[in-house]
Amino acid sequence: MNVLFVTMDGGGNVPPMLAVAAAVADAGHRVHVIGHETLEQQVENAGLAFKAYPTARDWDSRREHSALSWVPMFNDANIGADVRQLCERDTPDVAVVDCMLLPALAAVQDAAIPHAVFSHTQRHYLNGRYRLGAGTAARLYGYRISRLWDAADLNIVATVRRLDAESRRPQPANVRWVGAIVPARRPHRPDGPPLVLVSMSSNGFRGQRRTLARVVDALATLPLRAVVTTGGAVEPDTLPTAPNVEVRGYADHGALMPRCSLLIGHGGHDTTFRALAHDMPVLIIPASGLSDQRLVGQSIAAAGAGVTMGRSASTESIRHAIDAVLSHPGYQFAAAEIGREIRGSRAGDRAVQLITGLV
């Protein structure tokens, strides 16, 4: 079977789709991924064949962008044209399309290719704030977001169902929650001061450097060790220094997370649920009020597995929040419950079964 995965350089949307694509390939199927040129290395590192959009506008999510600048990228008609041309030349048996790429979704529907929408965050956000905001903007480009989603053969929602408020409402017949698709290892926390991982967005959200600086200043006053990763969006040497804080551009989160006791992050779905999969409670400081980050943070806080704060929070407020989450075992207990659920869900396998079942 020939399966096409259609994605974009949006940060946390990429890893779960690539995990599913790799699993489909491991099952013996032919897989191709098409996306922005900036994703080439990431896709090839996953062992997958990659094709860059030939005519889509240039896009690099690590650069600083205003919220409005994402709208033309989401609705880039050239993405639709590139996907349509690829489908005509190398007809896939199945296509899996990022939920935010409406031009690509329209293209595979026009080509009558069996397809799945890949929803990489909580549907509570996608069918609420995102549909009303980005969906309204998409109408100006001629795309009806609900119509395109509902017309798909399948809509895979890659998050923990019980933490997604939308799961308690009636849904279109094509919607399937599979669980969070994130890598996880059983935690192994060594004796000594707790290790804290700080990972804000790899996207260029404005104001992130100031938030990170306050986080470093807060960590410097506490009896712990911390690793701060900036992900290319912020230069490490622009942040304060402290004896107990190591600042890196990049680090292997998979190697760090089993040893960490807390994640301080922006609330991006992928990194947040990856931390929870390692039984880590989270302190979420959203980088953007228009993204899913605030709702992700609220859902985790409601489950007792973390705390969420505004990005203007003071150094002292951040310090108190870090101390509270590390000091009260209830946060770790709730995170561990979610972690066991994620590790036991086999979400990636469920997604593969649904995708390969379309033909």
Tell what function each PLM region has:
Residues 29-225, 232, 239-240:
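Nucleotide-sugar-dependent glycosyltransferase catalytic domains
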Residues 1-32, 38, 42-49, 85-89, ...:
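Nucleotide-activated sugar donor-binding and catalytic core shared by glycosyltransferases
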Residues 225-227, 281:
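A fold-wide structural signal in alpha/beta-hydrolase
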Residues 185, 235, 308-311:
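Short, solvent-exposed coil/turn linker segments
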